[in-house]
């Protein structure tokens, strides 16, 4: 799926006929990937990378989780904890998964695109989605790990970090 299409979806712009067809085709391809992964007993990790397409990707991931994360976890969403809203979103995702009867696949990472995100926010005139400092990122990352560990009955956790202290806490 084109990046520009994800941006249009994120901003709730109306899609034309060709864009709708492109979206449907991308959804079919993603579904095929998840289907084959489930048959081969492997996981699929999905990551938006940029905040300005994150909601679009989150929606697609939820569709796939609802379909494939019933018996076991196939699909994981990536939660970039350098964003100040991701701990709350993780908790909301857990509640959503519970309400819809699927297991949440959560890959936790700190994130690596701080400068890019801050620069874009400044250029576009919106508040930065990034934590104010590394300590805040570490705090939310560790809180997210703890939250997942406390809810393993309905969360499959992948801890993506090189941080020794976070590994020891997990």
Predicted regions and their residues:
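Positively charged, amphipathic and often flexible ligand-engagement surfaces
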Residues: 1-170
């Amino acid at each position: 799926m084109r990046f520009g299409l994800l941006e249009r979806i994120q901003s709730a712009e109306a899609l034309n006929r060709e864009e709708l067809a492109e979206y449907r085709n991308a959804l079919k391809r993603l579904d095929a990937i998840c289907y084959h992964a489930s048959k081969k007993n492997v996981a699929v990790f999905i990551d938006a990378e940029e905040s300005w397409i994150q909601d679009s990707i989150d929606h697609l991931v939820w569709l796939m989780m609802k379909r494939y994360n019933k018996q076991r976890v196939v699909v994981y969403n990536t939660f970039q904890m350098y964003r100040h809203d991701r701990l709350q979103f993780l908790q909301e995702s857990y509640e959503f998964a519970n309400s819809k009867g699927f297991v949440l696949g959560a890959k936790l990472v700190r994130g690596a695109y701080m400068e890019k995100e801050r620069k874009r926010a400044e250029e576009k005139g919106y508040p930065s989605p990034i934590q104010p400092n590394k300590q805040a990122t570490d705090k939310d990352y560790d809180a997210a790990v703890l939250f997942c560990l406390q809810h393993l009955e309905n969360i499959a956790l992948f801890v993506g970090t090189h941080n020794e202290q976070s590994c020891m806490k997990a």
